[in-house]
């Protein structure tokens, strides 16, 4: 058993496969995700886990060099993203999901609590 960090095996595997510039997303529980995109579903019930809880668990595990959010994303979600952010329409964000390596579905119920991240490099 792992001593620390992420425990979800699907999430650990998905992160380990990421390369520089690959995209992936953290989403609220209502975001429509394209059928061909891998979903790592962490949602238990409405509100658990929150977007913030999931993002805080991910931050020590991944290198991020950019992010995409939709117009209307709440300021508290924007503030959690510690990188350069591109703002697009909600429809454009949903279209970009088709290119993501995976989407992590949270139990978050805040509208527009969705962020696409661009993987960076650790060296």
Swiss-Prot record:
Its EC number is 5.4.99.62. It catalyses: beta-D-ribopyranose = beta-D-ribofuranose. Substrate binds at residues 28, 90, 112-114. The active site is at 20 (proton donor). It is found in: Cytoplasm. GO terms for cellular component: cytosol. GO terms for biological process: D-ribose catabolic process. It comes from the Bacteria. One of its GO terms (molecular function) is monosaccharide binding. Pathway: Carbohydrate metabolism; D-ribose degradation; D-ribose 5-phosphate from beta-D-ribopyranose: step 1/2. It is an enzyme of class 5 (isomerase). Pfam families: RbsD_FucU. Keywords: Carbohydrate metabolism, Cytoplasm, Isomerase. SUPFAM superfamilies: RbsD-like. InterPro entries: D-ribose_pyranase, RbsD-like_sf, RbsD_FucU. Homodecamer. Belongs to the RbsD / FucU family. RbsD subfamily. Catalyzes the interconversion of beta-pyran and beta-furan forms of D-ribose. PANTHER family: D-RIBOSE PYRANASE (PTHR37831:SF1). This is D-ribose pyranase. It comes from Corynebacterium glutamicum (strain R). The lineage of its organism: Bacteria, Bacillati, Actinomycetota, Actinomycetes, Mycobacteriales.
